[in-house]
Amino acid sequence: MMSTNFQWPGTNKNDNTEVSVETPSSTDPHVPRYPFTAMSHATASTTMKKRKRDDFDGDKSTTITMNTTTTRKYIQSSLGSSKFKKAKTPKISGQPLPLPRLIESLDKSNLQKLVQDLITVHPELQSTLIKISPRPSIQDSIQLLQDKFDMIISHLPYKCDVESDYSYLRIKPHLQEFLSSVSDFILNYLPPLETNMTHSLQFLHETTKLVYNLPNFTNQEFQYTKSSALEQIANCWLIVLSQDEEKEGNTDVVKVIQELELLEKLHEHNEISFNKFEKVVDYCKDKLEQHELIMNNNEAGSGVTSSISDLITVDYSKYSIANTTSI
């Protein structure tokens, strides 16, 4: 009995005849009972051995390749790291400017603020700074006062009377700064600190012009301040001119008065300041008159001496050594 829809190979579904197939006898000992099965097992065993050998060879080749690749990568990474170490630069970090370079980069206002802050923090350095700092020249001192004077003029109001109280109050802080600077610089050019009379008088002359060229404000406070300032400056003129007065026969003052033409300049200052410099003018006149009197007396004395020497004549030939020996 056969299953439906199933047939053996070589059979016809519609044919009911049986076909006999001759097979070797199962009783023959020389013939394998399952020849195809034996061959199949031998072939499979050989194939498996070959596959194992191929797999082993492949694994070995893969292992060698992987080892070679790993070694090459290690060598390359070692070479790369060694090159990187050779090219490596030291670490650089930011740092402030050295003090000389920092001072060099500062402008005038910042440098001035730096010194003032330094004195505020360390007040004991004030005397040292005064001692080691160079003295300003006359030109620099006058220029500084001129700048402060210009600051006063630049702050005057445009649409207002220049001499009014409003104008004065507006420039008052700058006026106070100017007069304070004048006082400080005048003291710097007085003896015995300043030994050169010419320098002192030149500075006083320029400073006096700046003071009386200030706007003539009608404010009473300003008028009093300006008058007092001119009186003090006139006294400083006398201090400078009389510094060597104790020296007997001193002609330096007269020489300076003549070379600088001080008498003419003082006349101008006295006229503009309403006779504030009258004492200075009288002092210079007195010095010039004394010098002229001394010069006239010297000339007169030299003339009298020459006339007396002309009247007294002695013949010294009789008292010569030759005449004495001949006797």
UniProtKB/Swiss-Prot annotation:
Pfam families: Cut8. The keyword Lipoprotein does not apply. Residues 1-63 are annotated as: Disordered. Residues 37-47 have a biased composition (Low complexity). Keywords: Cytoplasm, Nucleus, Protein transport, Transport. The keyword Manganese does not apply. Residues 1-28 have a biased composition (Polar residues). InterPro entries: Cut8/Sts1_fam (IPR013868), Cut8/Sts1_sf (IPR038422). It is found in: Cytoplasm; Nucleus. One of its GO terms (molecular function) is proteasome binding. GO terms for cellular component: cytoplasm; nucleus. GO terms for biological process: nuclear protein quality control by the ubiquitin-proteasome system; proteasome localization; protein transport. It comes from the Eukaryota. PANTHER family: FI02826P (PTHR28032:SF1). Involved in ubiquitin-mediated protein degradation. Regulatory factor in the ubiquitin/proteasome pathway that controls the turnover of proteasome substrates. Targets proteasomes to the nucleus and facilitates the degradation of nuclear proteins. Binds the proteasome. Belongs to the cut8/STS1 family. This is Tethering factor for nuclear proteasome STS1. The gene is STS1.
